[in-house]
Amino acid sequence: MCIICASKSGVRQPTERELFTMFQNNPHGAGYMYARDGRVHIHKGFMDIDSFLSAVKAEHFTAKDSVVYHFRISTQAGVNPEMTHPFPLSNRLSHMKALDVECPCGVAHNGIIRLTSDPSQREYSDTALFITHYMARMVHGLDDLKDAQLLNRIERLAGSKLAIMDGSVYIATVGNFINERGLLFSNDSYRELRWRHRA
């Protein structure tokens, strides 16, 4: 099902343990995006925890940074680096496969989008199709991310959760997120499973 973790500017970054747990519970690849110098920088396609943690550590993120992390469980288009998240907001499908990209706006998704789900689709995920066919036509400028009516319309179409970041470091969330000491999680798979044995 995936998980999104959004760290807005002024909030802590997730711990290494939290990152590890999210990857362990959503093991089909990871990525992240951050805003700097008016652009969103996306790095994705990390298919193992070590390469992901190395990349994140090299960024030296602090509470000043606005960062969205994503960990995937594949529901369409298989397990591959290209369909990990985040994606650039674009109307061109070929842009969805870029592993390292700068763009005005980036998107991460959690859930299944029935509108664009197609079990026979082997190349593009429901998220990639939703972004190119729907979102790219709806979001035209940075102010759109602060338009509650537009975000509600996107939520009704997607039927799931999204984090959308623009180059100004603003993060809009669509759907209900869990606030855990400032971090926003799209579900509870950031928590370690705790087993209790009863004698």
Regions found by a protein language model. Give the residues of each.
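Extreme N-terminus nucleophile/cap motif
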Residues: 1-57, 67, 158, 176-199
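Short acidic-glycine loop/turn motifs at beta-strand connectors
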Residues: 34-39, 91, 165-170
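Regulatory input/activation interfaces that engage signals or partners
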Residues: 65, 70-71, 75
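Histidine-centered active-site/metal-ligand motif
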Residues: 70, 85-86, 109
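Acidic loop->beta-strand submotif enriched in PP2C/PPM serine/threonine phosphatases
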Residues: 77-104
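Conserved beta-strand-loop-short alpha-helix elements that form
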Residues: 103-118
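Short histidine
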Residues: 114-175
